A protein has these predicted regions:
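A short coil-to-beta-strand element that immediately follows conserved catalytic motifs
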Residues: 104-114
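Non-catalytic cap/lid and distal C-terminal segments of serine-dependent acyl enzymes
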Residues: 14-17, 29, 115, 183-185, ...
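Generic preference for hydrophobic/aromatic residues in regular secondary structure cores
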Residues: 2, 22-28, 33, 116, ...
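Generic internal hydrophobic packing segments that stabilize the cores of diverse globular domains
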Residues: 84, 88, 92, 113-116, ...
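Catalytic core of non-heme Fe(II) oxygenases with the double-stranded beta-helix
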Residues: 117-189
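Non-heme Fe(II)/2-oxoglutarate
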Residues: 11-106, 122-126
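Residues at beta-strand starts and edge strands
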Residues: 23-25, 110-112, 136-138
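N-terminal amphipathic/basic-hydrophobic helices that include classical n-h-c signal peptides
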Residues: 1-11
Length: 189
């Protein structure tokens, strides 16, 4: 993992991120405290008014709620936004940084959806892709809360797997890194 530092990105000072290459780049950022706090507060304060996102997501998770959807209205989901402009601007700035870091130019960006997966014991998300209305797109995970324990590891306890995020790569070959299980902390993105 390499650490890079940029001076400014759309008023984001000292943008720090980690980098892993899995056939495509995976960048790991730390969310500013004000953005992190805003998302958590909005989720908790509006929980009863948030649209369930379970019908359109693959996760085997009871509590999946949408904070933002800006796509075509569907039977499963209609356009809505509970997030203030500074939060959606943060997402867009990070996605634009990702594209610039990878030297991807002339790529139109559209923020399609933001939701919360509130996972409990025995719930999981199978391997899947995110693509919105297109076959290409950027996907992200932000850590808003973590439990005090992920439970007992029933096998290979020296290699912790419970509650881990696993990102699968698009590379092959003898020395290729094919997956990444980042250590997760609050505010990781």
């Amino acid at each position: 993992i390499a650490t890079k530092r940029k001076k400014k990105l759309n008023n984001m000072e000292n943008l720090k991120f980690d980098f892993v290459f899995l056939g495509q780049s995976v960048l790991k950022y730390q969310v500013p405290l004000d953005i992190f706090t805003a998302i958590n507060q909005i989720y908790e304060q509006n929980y009863n008014n948030l649209a369930p996102a379970n019908q359109q997501l693959v996760g085997k998770i009871e509590n999946e709620h949408s904070l933002f959807y800006h796509g075509e209205d569907q039977t499963k989901m209609k356009n809505h936004n509970f997030l203030p402009r500074n939060v959606t601007d943060y997402f867009m700035a990070i996605f634009k940084h990702y594209l610039a870091f990878n030297k991807i130019k002339d790529y139109d960006t559209h923020l399609n959806s933001i939701w919360v997966n509130e996972m409990k014991q025995h719930e999981y998300n199978p391997a899947h892709i995110h693509r919105g209305m297109l076959f290409t797109g950027l996907s992200s995970v932000m850590i808003l809360k973590l439990p005090s324990t992920f439970g007992k590891e029933y096998s290979a306890s020296e290699i912790q797997q419970n509650g881990r995020l696993q990102i699968l790569g698009a590379a092959n070959g003898q020395f290729a890194k094919i997956d990444y299980q980042p250590p997760m902390d609050l505010r990781d993105f």
